[in-house]
Curated annotation (Swiss-Prot):
It comes from Thermosipho melanesiensis (strain DSM 12029 / CIP 104789 / BI429). This is LexA repressor. Represses a number of genes involved in the response to DNA damage (SOS response), including recA and lexA. In the presence of single-stranded DNA, RecA interacts with LexA causing an autocatalytic cleavage which disrupts the DNA-binding part of LexA, leading to derepression of the SOS regulon and eventually DNA repair. NCBIfam families: lexA. Pfam families: LexA_DNA_bind, Peptidase_S24. The keyword Transmembrane helix does not apply. It is an enzyme of class 3 (hydrolase). Transmembrane segments: none annotated. CDD domains: S24_LexA-like. GO terms for biological process: DNA repair; DNA replication; negative regulation of DNA-templated transcription; proteolysis; SOS response. Keywords: Autocatalytic cleavage, DNA damage, DNA repair, DNA replication, DNA-binding, Hydrolase, Repressor, SOS response, Transcription, Transcription regulation. The active site is at S120, K157.
Length: 199
């Protein structure tokens, strides 16, 4: 959904509260009276809320405003495990999905999750057993955390491209960076979030 202006948010909040208190929606005149607007001014805000996907309405019925239930979470596939260490073999087939908050992703894209094995990224607050949420992409800015394939193994590291070399830097002071030829690695995803379950 598109972002609301401050005034549109106030109108939406009024509509929500009105429905909760009365069991039916306000009319355009109710909205206009509350905000000291002309009916036309109130109508403009209602149309904006409808266009942005926050409400639906029937123009033939003065009290037909309905709130659109926002999707709070989505399911994305878990494609296997990823090493936060020396690297593990390429994706295993995993018939699993994980639920993540919609706010964790932005815009269009292909998202997937991998389960972390190892502790090379602990200083970035990524620990063994976490699920990392990745946006599928093949190019990534320097300094970002990425899932990369190297020597047929997939690993999670901070990524730096330097001329014809790539440096994969762990977030663990006890571990050393991996330096390799750029042609020998493949970026498969950019880190966008972490999910952790507590037992």
């Amino acid at each position: 959904m598109k972002k609301l202006t401050e005034k549109q948010q106030k109108v939406l909040d009024f509509i929500k509260n009105y429905i909760q208190q009365n069991g039916y929606s306000p009319s355009i005149r109710d909205i206009a009276k509350h905000f000291k607007l002309t009916p036309r001014g109130a109508h403009i805000h209602v149309i904006a809320l409808e266009k942005k996907g926050y409400i639906t309405r029937n123009p033939k019925n003065s009290r037909s405003i309905s709130l659109v239930k926002r999707q709070e979470s989505i399911l994305i596939p878990v494609k296997g495990k990823i090493s936060a260490g020396m690297g593990i073999e390429m994706f295993e087939i995993v018939d699993e999905e994980i639920e993540i908050p919609v706010r964790m992703i932005s815009g269009f894209g292909n998202y997937f999750a991998l389960k972390v094995e190892g502790n090379s990224m602990i200083d970035a607050h990524i620990i063994n057993g976490d699920y990392v949420i990745l946006k599928k992409q093949y190019r990534i800015p320097n300094g970002q955390i990425a899932a990369v394939v190297f020597d047929n193994k997939v690993t999670l590291k901070r990524f730096y491209h330097k001329k014809d070399k790539v440096e994969l830097v762990p977030e663990n002071k006890d571990m050393n960076p991996i330096v390799c030829d750029a042609k020998d690695i493949k970026v498969i995803g950019k880190l966008v979030g972490i999910i952790r379950f507590y037992e």
